[in-house]
Amino acid sequence: MKAGIHPDYHPVVFEDSSTGKRFLTRSTATSERTVEWTDGNTYPLLVVDVTADSHPFWTGAQRLLDTQGRVEKFNRKYGRRVRGGQEG
């Protein structure tokens, strides 16, 4: 690899904003906010909306969508149209 063309890859703490869980990993992302980790070192802190700790795929929790409302909206917009005087 060429020297000087790659971003700095360093340890970063990510925090799930909905659960508050934090995990230490490596990333090129940076932040002005910092946090002291359990090992006594200080790392940049990035707060994110969704992680494996809160994502429905990983937690098994389901989110119900208003599919009935979407179907009705679709039918109103694109539903049965009249062609040449016949319903079709």
From Swiss-Prot:
GO BP annotations, alphabetical order: translation
Task: Read off the Pfam families from this record.
Answer: Ribosomal_L31 (PF01197)
Extent of the signal sequence: none
| Entry GO terms, CC | ribonucleoprotein complex; ribosome
What are the GO MF terms of this UniProt record? structural constituent of ribosome
Q: Which UniProt keywords apply?
A: Ribonucleoprotein, Ribosomal protein
Q: Report which superkingdom the organism of origin falls in.
A: Bacteria
Q: Which InterPro entries match?
A: Ribosomal_bL28/bL31-like_sf, Ribosomal_bL31, Ribosomal_bL31_B, Ribosomal_bL31_sf
* Subunit structure, interactors included: Part of the 50S ribosomal subunit.
Task: Report the family membership.
Answer: Belongs to the bacterial ribosomal protein bL31 family. Type B subfamily.
- What is the protein's given name? Large ribosomal subunit protein bL31B
